[in-house]
Each structure stands twice: as C-alpha cells, then as structure tokens.
Amino acid sequence: MCIRDSYESVKDNDAKVSDVKEALEDAVHRQLMSDVPYGVLLSGGLDSSVISAIAKKYAAKRIETDGASDAWWPQLHSFAIGLKGAPDLIKAREVAEYIGTVHHEINYTVQEGLDAIRDVIYFIETYDVTTVRASTPMYLLARVIKSMGIKMVLSGEGADEVFGGYLYFHKAPTPKDFHEETVRKLSKLHMYDCLRANKSLSAWGVEGRVPFLDKEFLDVAMALNPKAKMCPGKEIEKRIVREAFADMLPESVAWRQKEQFSDGVGYSWIDTLREITAAAVSDEQMEHAAERFPINTPLNKEEYYYRSIFEEHFPSESAARSVPSVPSVACSTAEALAWDVAFRNLNEPSGRAVRGVHEEAYAEEVK
C-alpha cells in the first residue's frame, strides 16, 4: 500500500472519476467475501450509502465463485440507528428504499445512550470526546445486529480522511495543505474512527469491514491530484465520489452535506451530553484538572467526565498516554486549526462548529 505522503508525488496527477468508481467497486467486491451472514451499516450519509449501493449490486451472487452461483443469503440487510426523527434515519430509509435493501431502523433514547457510556468507554478504551460520542450509538446498534445473527457488516469509515470530507477541509488554504492533512488523518485513524468501528462492533462479536480503507483502493485514491479533492468556500466536499456514484443513489443523498455520525444520529444527543457533563463536572474540578490528570489534562468538562470513567477502568499512566488529547474542530488535527483564525479559540469536534459551512451550525462559538 502506498499512502503517498509527499505532495510532490501527486500534485501533477490526474483525478479521474472513472478510476475512483472502478477501484471502490472492486474494493467492496473483495470485502464481501464471507461465509457468514453479512449486512451494511447505512447511516444515510454519502459514504455508507455508496458502500451499501455497491454491496447491493453484488449481494445476489457468491463472491467466492466469482458470481457463478447464487448467494446463500441474497437479501442484503441494512442497519441504521438514531434518535427518533434524526436526520440520518430519514435519509437511510430513503436510500434503503431506493437500492432495495431489507432495512432495519433502530431508535434509541438519550437515556439509553447515557446508560451505556460507562460500558462503551470500557470496550473502546479511550476518553476521546468525539469517539465516545459516536461509539455509543454504534455500540447499541451492534447489539441489535448480533441478535439478528449477522456476523459481518460493511461500513463507510475512511472516506472523510481519504477525500477530505470533514467540513473543516473547506478552509484548507492550498492543495498541499489539504493533501498533508489527509495523510495526517489517515495516520491517526486507528485512534479514532477505526477504533470506534472496530471496538464498538467487536464488543458484540460483529466484524466490521471498511472498503474505503482497502489497500488497493487507497493506492488509487491517495494518488489523485489533491486539487480535485478540494472544496473551497461553499463547494460541496467529496465531489469526485459524488460524481462517481450519483447514478446509484437518490439525488438528495448523493449531494447531501457531510454530517458526522455523532451529529447525524440526532443533534440532541451531543447537546444533552454537553449539558449533562457540564452539570456533572464543577468549575472547581476543572480548575484542578491538571492535579488530578497531569497526563493529557482534560480540555473541557465533557472530556473530564469521560476521563474519570476511563480512569476507573484503566488507572495506569500508560493507559492515559495511549489516548490522543488535542484541540480539534470538526475532527481536525491540531495542525489544521491554523487554517482559520476562527478555529484558534475553539475545541469542538462536532461539524456544527464550522460556522459559515455547516447548514445547522452552532449560533455561538463552542469552546
């Protein structure tokens, strides 16, 4: 696999939509090889919808026989989770009907999520705020998937890192900055989204596979000219992926703005977490946070709350050091905070922190 660290090695390359389409379809085809019942995680966002649509294309035939025989379970099952009326649930339902999957919609309540957080932190082994936020609904979803006898699911993780899909990428000043940030994001993925998907699912014995991170696909995707991936100003992110698969998806989904998983399951999930943790952690505790947690001192009350639970499960210093703890806006690296002066006083991983880009952005700065 070649991640193409150097901008110089890719800056003059082509960026063909057909190359992306062929490489991703091949990746999904490879990842579908399985002797157990499988399904797809369908959030209703672009990435999971693309993976689901491609999987549906191949689901009727056995991959192991190169399509020469019928699949043992030809009906593709898709799964979505969210608070009642969540943006993701509405779009996932639309995609499932369009591509023809057997769709399962799981509603959870904020209280169910809160009740699960202690177990979630134990299984995912991190106190990173965005990972805990997103892992909780995925953990609850995996429980349902396991109960139905599904052993493996395909998921859309990795696309935002490869194609610069997070909303803060709109602020990338140059193609070089854009490309170098995608490389940084990929190099840290095992501490964030891959950790979430792997451990939230495996806690219930479900295997997750991620075609966007297929090695052969990465060879193609990371060699694309970074300029073609950029989304300056109001341009939509991941345009090359949208153009490649627009004919396989409802138009409203193919051109839907990026919504992070922890936002898409329902805005009130994150808002309630912030309220609960703000009430649970006092100002005095935050003032003395460095005394209690000298390693990776929590940057806000929500992180302090998760860190306290983490310490109960994993009290050693080495465990604390294993978790990244840096300021972030919409899942950015610390380096990308320099892209916009408005980022410099922020520390909020939600995409709604990118004011002027997210359609439902916070009215005020979140610190």
Go through each PLM region and give its residues.
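Non-catalytic nucleic-acid substrate-recognition regions in nucleic-acid-modifying enzymes
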Residues: 283
